Every structure is written in structure tokens, then in C-alpha cells.
From Swiss-Prot:
The gene is rpsO. It comes from the Bacteria. Gene3D superfamilies: 6.10.250.3130, S15/NS1, RNA-binding. One of its GO terms (cellular component) is cytosolic small ribosomal subunit. Part of the 30S ribosomal subunit. Forms a bridge to the 50S subunit in the 70S ribosome, contacting the 23S rRNA. NCBIfam families: S15_bact (TIGR00952). GO terms for molecular function: rRNA binding; structural constituent of ribosome. Pfam families: Ribosomal_S15 (PF00312). Belongs to the universal ribosomal protein uS15 family. InterPro entries: Ribosomal_uS15, Ribosomal_uS15_bac-type, uS15_NS1_RNA-bd_sf. HAMAP family: Ribosomal_uS15_B (MF_01343_B). This is Small ribosomal subunit protein uS15.
Length: 89
């Protein structure tokens, strides 16, 4: 259900703006998207897991806030990120 350390490192390496960058909005959104996708798969088998569903909604809200911030600061980076992650907007 959670992402592995190797997968998280790969996401950080792929979306980092500079070496060792873990806090940029791109990296945070990529990690949240991976966690959201994992939880979405979890809910296909466990439809009544409402505790995890609340966590999913929190993650989606957090990702939306980060994307809004990125869109306000740099729309080019925003559009590149949502196209590479396949997020609708």
C-alpha cells in the first residue's frame, strides 16, 4: 500500500530540479500522486475501508494545493508536470 524507498528515490531523481531536491512542488506532487494511485488500487478490493479513504481525500487536497501554488508561481512547470504525471486539470 505504501511506496518503497527505491520507488520514492526514483521519483525524487526524476522530478528534482537540482541534486538532492526533495522539497520542490514537483517532487512532492509526484510522490503524492504515486501514493494516491496505490490507494486507488487498494479501494478496488476494499470498498468499505473508510479510514483509508479519508487519508486519500487528504492527500488529494494536499496535492491540489501544491498544484495551485505551482500554477501561480510558474505555469510552464505546472503544465509540464501535469502532462508527465497524467493528471487531469
Amino acid at each position: 500500500m505504501s511506496i518503497t524507498a527505491e520507488r520514492k528515490s526514483a521519483l525524487i531523481k526524476e522530478y528534482a530540479t537540482v541534486e538532492g531536491d526533495t522539497g520542490s512542488p514537483e517532487v512532492q506532487v509526484a510522490i503524492l500522486t504515486e501514493r494516491i494511485n496505490n490507494l486507488t488500487e487498494h479501494f478496488k478490493d476494499h470498498k468499505k475501508d473508510n479510514h483509508s479513504r479519508r487519508g486519500l481525500l487528504t492527500m488529494v487536497s494536499s496535492r491540489r494545493s501544491l498544484l495551485d501554488y505551482l500554477k501561480k508561481k510558474d505555469e510552464g512547470r505546472y503544465s509540464k508536470l501535469i502532462s508527465s504525471l497524467g493528471i487531469r486539470r
